[in-house]
Amino acid sequence: MSKNQYTKTALKEAIAGKLQRHFGREVADASKEQVYEACALVVRDALTEHMIETQNEVEKYGERQVHYLCMEFLVGRSLRNNAYNLGILPELTEALKDMGYEMADIFEEEADPGLGNGGLGRLAACYMDGMATIGVRGTGYSIRYEHGIFKQKIEDGQQVELPDSWLASGDVWHIPAMDDTREVKIGGTVNTYFNDQGKLIVEYHDYTPVLAVPYDMPISGYDTNNIACLRLWEAKSPIALDMKLFSSGEYLKALEKHAMAETISMVLYPEDNHREGQSLRLKQQYFLVSATLQDICAKHKAKYGTLENFAHKHVLHINDTHPTLVIPELMRILMDENDMSWEQAWNITSQSVAYTNHTVMPEALECWPVSLVQELMPRIMQIIYEINERFCKELWNYFPNDFQKISKLAIVSDNTVRMAHLAIAGSFSINGVSALHSEILKDRVFNDFYKIYSSKFCNVTNGIAHRRWLCEANPELAELIESKIGRGYRKHPSELQVLANYGNDKVLLQRLGEIKRDNKQRLANYIKEHNGIEVNMDSIFDVQVKRLHEYKRQMLNILHIISLYHKLKDNPGMDFVPRTFIFGSKAAPGYAVAKKTIRLINSIANMINNDPDIGDKLKVVFIEDYKVSLAEMIMPAAEVSEQISIAGKEASGTGNMKFMMNGALTIGTMDGANVEICEAVGRENIFIFGMETPEAEALAASGNYEPMLIYQNDPVIKRVLDHMINGFGDGVDYTDIANLLLHGGNGGPADRYMSLKDFSSYAIAQERVSEMYRHAENWNYMSLMNIANSGRFASDRSVAEYAQNIWRVKTNFAF
C-alpha cells in the first residue's frame, strides 16, 4: 500500500482484520495489548513491502552495502516512530479514536526492547534511522537478547535487578528468517595442515555447535521507501535432547547442552568480574561476528561467485571494540573456506573494516586473556597470533630495537589480546565521536599508532535522530517551529538555524515557555504517580539522566544538592529559586560504587523531600528504570541539562544533544560534544565550568592533587562530607563514599574524577543558572538559541559524514 492508501477507513479495516485473524477478536472485545499488536502488524506489513523493494534494488544495482555491527541497539518503541516516518500517524490516531481508543494508551502497551543499555546502543539506533532516511543501504547486526539488560526496581533506596521479559510483546516487529540460520563453532580443538595440493586444511574437533537464527527488524526512514534492516541473531542448540538422560530423571543434565548454547543470547553485558562471565561475553562477541560474516559472505558469493571483490561491495563498521573479532573471522573465512593466501585475505579484510572508538577509559578498551580466546575459538587465536607477529614486524620498521614500545603497541602481549590494537591494525578507518575526543585519541590514547597511521584517523561527531527526539517526543514544540520555518528541517535539520532570526519575537518566546511548562506538567504527573512526590511547577527542572559511572560525576551533582540543603536549613526564608533535581540511571550489577551512589541519591531525596523546613523549594527525584520511552518524556520537560563529566573522559555524549534540541540549557564542562555545543550556541547561552582537559590531565599526572586539603580549607565541602559520614537519618552508612573522595580506594587515588576540585566552579555556575532563570524572557531566548543551533547534531548529518568520508557510498543528504 502507498501512503495515500492509508486512509482512516483503510486503517480501521486493516486493524480489525488483524484482530480477527490473529486473535479471534472483534474490535469491541479486544484488549489494548491486542489492539497494539494489530496496529503493529499493519504497520509492519507496510515496512516489509518497502524492505523487499529496498533489497531488490540493492540486488539489482549492486550498490556498496554498509554492515553496522554493535553489541546493542537501543531502538525504543517502534509503533509511533514507524507511523510517523510513514506519514500515517494522524490517520492512525483518528482510526483508533473511531474504534474507541486513545493513541497514547495504545503506545503504552509496547514494551521498550531490551536490546541496549545506554548511549552506545541509542546512537546505533539513531544511525539506523539516519541510514534509512538519507538512502544508505545499511544493515545493523546484533543479538536478540531474551532479557536485555535488566529491569530496575528501587527497594529501600537500592537498585534491584529483575529480568526484563520484553519479548512477550516486543517480537511483533521481528520477522524470522530461518533460511539464513548459520552455525557458529565454539571451543574444541583445531588441527591445521597442508594437503598434497598445497591447500590449507583446517579440522575442528570436539567443538560445541551453536545455531544463529536471524530475526529481521525493519527500520523505517522518514518520508522514504528506503528501509534499513536490523538483523538480530538468536542462539539455539542443534543438539537433540538426550531422551535417555531425561527418561532416567537426569533432567538438568539432559538440558545442559541446550542451556549452554542458548545462554549466549540470554542477557546483554553479563557481569565479567569472573571467568564465567568473561567467557559468556566473549562467546557473545564471536557469535555475533561469525554469524554475521558467514551470512554476508555466503550471499556475496552466491551473487558474484567469488569473495575477491568483497571490499568493493561491503563495509564492515564495528561500533566500539566488542565486534573486533570480525577481523580474524573474515580472515578465517577467506583463507580456510575460500583458499586465499594470507596476503590476499589481509588486503581484503583491511580494506573492509572501519572502527569507531567510543571511550578513552583504559578499562573500557577491551582486553581478553589469551587462554580464554584459545579455549573458546582456537582457530581465531591462531590467526590473531599471526596478525600480531606481522604487525610487530611492521612496528619494528618504525621503532627499531625499541622492544618496550613494540610490546606496548602489540596486539598480543602479557598473555592478553588487546582488542583496540587489533581494531587499529585491521581497519582502514578509525574515528572518534567528537572533535575533542578525536584529538585525545590522536594526542594521547593512540598517539604512537597515529604517528604511523595518521591517514586512518578522522572524526565524526555523534548525532541524534532529531525527528524522534524533537518532532515525536515534543510535538507542541515541533508545531511551533513549523509555524515559523515550515517542515523542511525534518529532512534538512540545518534549517533549524532560521529560528535564530526570531529571538526578538516576544510572542514566540512566551509560547516557548508555555510549551516547556506543559511538558513539565506531564513529567510532574508521572513523578506524582510513580514516586509519590509533588514537585513545584515553578521550580527549575534540573536533570541528570545517563548511565551511572564515577566519571560522569553524579557525585558532583549530589554534593551540590546537599550544600543547597544546608543553605536552606540555615536560612529558610532566603530568596531561593526553587529546584527539582531529577536523576535517572542504571548501575551495572557488579559496580558497587555506582549502586551505592543510587542509594545515596535516594537517601538524600528521602531527607530533603520530607523536611518541612524545605517545603517545595527543593526536591530530589530518582526515576526508576530509565529507558527510551521515559527519556522521550523527560527530555522535553528538562530546563537544565547536567553534562558534568570531568573534562577529557566523555567521548561525546548524545543526551546533551537531545536536551539542547528540546530547549534545555546545558551546565557542563568542556568535555565531549559539550565543546561543540558551546561553539554552536556561544558561551552566553550555556553554563560552562570547571577545568578543561589539559589542566585536568596535568593535575592527574602530577600526583599533586590532594582533596583532603580542599576538605580542610573549604567549609562548604567539609560540611557536606561530614554530613555524608554522619548519615542522612535512615541508618545507611556512607563513610565508604566519603573515603573514596578523601582517601581513595580499590587501588585508585582520592577523588579520582576530581569532583571536589571542580565543586566551587560548579556551584558558581549553578548560581548563574538560578539568576538567569528569574528572567523568563531571557531564559526562553537562550532556550531558542539552543534549539536553533541543534541541527548540526542530527544523526542524518553524522551518517552522511560517515557515508562520504569513510564508507564511500552515495546519499541523498545535502550538507
Predicted segments with their positions:
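A conserved ligand/cofactor-binding region detector
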Residues: 1-815
